Structure formats: C-alpha cells, structure tokens
Amino acid sequence: MTSRSSLPRWPTLNLERRSDGRVCGIDEAGCAPLAGPVVAAAVVLPPGPKPTALRGLTDSKLLSAEKREDFFRRIQDIAQVGVGMASVEEIDTLNIHHADLLAMKRAFEALPASPDHALVDGRSKPALGCNVEAIVKGDRRSLSIAAASVVAKVTRDRMMRELAGRFPDYGWHTNVGYGTDAHYLGLLRKGPTEHHRRSFAPVNTIFSPMATAWQRFRFEPVQDAASADGLDLFFLRNDLYAVFDRRGRHIGLVKNLRGCWTFRAIGYHDGGKPETGTGPFSRYDGMRVEAPQAQMVIRLLSTG
C-alpha cells in the first residue's frame, strides 16, 4: 500500500522501467456517478525518456478541465491508446466493480498491439492477457496510468456533456453525472432517465416500485401566501434534504455546509426551473438550522 507521503511530486516512468517489454497504464473514470457509463483507458507511451509533451501531467482529478483537454490531445499524438466502457445496463447487471473491470479489459483489448505488462490504478486486477500489477494511487506514481486517467476522464466527460443537450434538467453539462444538488433536484422533478443507474441510490430507493412519496411533490411557483405550517423534509443524501410545504410544493433545501445545517430557499419561475435564493422563503436563504428536522425548519421559517 502506498502512503501519501511516499508519492512522487509528479508521476514517473520508474514503474514502467521495471518491466521488460511493452507496458501499458490503465485507469477508469465514472465509478461513482448516478448516471452514464464507466469508461476506462489503456495507454502505451513511447519508449525512451519522459516525453516533454507530458511535462506537468498527473492524476486527472488534479488537473483543470482545460489542462485535461490539452493533455488528451498530446497523449493521442504520441501514445497508443485504447478506450473501453461498460454501459449502464452492464453496471446494473454486474455491479459497478465488475463493470469497471470489464471496461478495463475492453480498453486493453482496444490497443493496436497487446502489451506484455499492465499497470492498473487501484487494488483490483482485471483479467488480461499479460502480467497485471495493481498500483494504489497509480495515477500519482505512473506516467502511463496518469495518461490513462486523463483519456478516460475526458472521454467520459465529453459523452455526458453531449447527453446534457438531450437531458438538460440534471446538470450533466457540469456535474457529468455525479450526485450534485442539481442532479438530485433533477431526479425529483423529472425522474430517472435511461442513462441513470437503477442499482444506485437514490434512484433505487426514491423510484423503487414500492416508493410513492415522490409522486406528490410539485415543482411550481408558489402564488399564494406562504406558510411554514406542515413542512416536510425528504431525505436525499446524508448532507441534503428537500423541503416541501404542506401542499407538496418544493420550497428549499436543508444542506450541511462545512458542518452547519443551512436552509437554502428555492423558487420556481417561468419554465419551471429552480432558482436558488428565491421563492416564498428567500428571506431565510443561508440561515442556519439546528438540525435536519421538520420542526426545526418550521421554527426558522416562522420567525419574524
């Protein structure tokens, strides 16, 4: 196991040079999101010293979107690249762990020539036709794995942003399928799409065949006099609750921000899209709540 203190400042080719023959790095993107496929990439860098074109390359999560796009183009120019993915249906059927391994195997098989050795980020080893070494925090240690992490991340992000044009209510253009507040609200308002992972919470809890609570929720402008009486909180995440009035109309969120529970007002205007900081209880936006409990929120919103 690799400790953080032992990580090099930048990924190197030291692990690649320990092995004879051709070496590829493999990494994935998209294990945690609520929607979209999991994508893996396999990268074989050219032999010789560290390419100057990849100076500054590291784990894709530590790079800006602009840097990732730049390195993506550079990697495509100098390296052999294979990309594989596992669909939402495969994720739900196999589970995310086995779907992840399947995507890695497909990425490996998509390379133009089979490597002799594979360095894989993490602890799990996909079944490949060569020697496989799992490297904890490999995207911080191996340049090949870092390159694969960028290719996988950019490929998947592009896919999700394209889907956002067809499904604009979930914030995929920015969250690329991860469980942000906007994504959760989109699920409540519009329900899951064909691209959502039905085996993942909250999709498999809120929208299970036995669950009906969400059907009474309304996402519309509140035209009448607002009242805090009879408010209801609906659990979304450990740090996030949706707040509805007694008629089932959505009026806000209770969110844990830096250890403090906070009320965020939400209003609905033309087109039915939510807007934070507006709505009938906008004057309370950003105020603290003692706990994520209906009575605590009622107490806050009933103050003068």
Language-model-detected regions and their locations in the chain:
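Residue-level recognition of conserved beta-strand positions in structured domain cores
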Residues: V44, M85, D245, N256, ...
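RNase H-like, Mg2+-dependent phosphodiesterase core
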Residues: M1-R218
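Negatively charged, low-complexity tracts enriched in Asp/Glu with abundant Ser/Thr
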Residues: T212-R246, G272-P280, Y284
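Ampiphathic alpha-helical segments that act as solvent-exposed interaction surfaces
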Residues: E275-G304
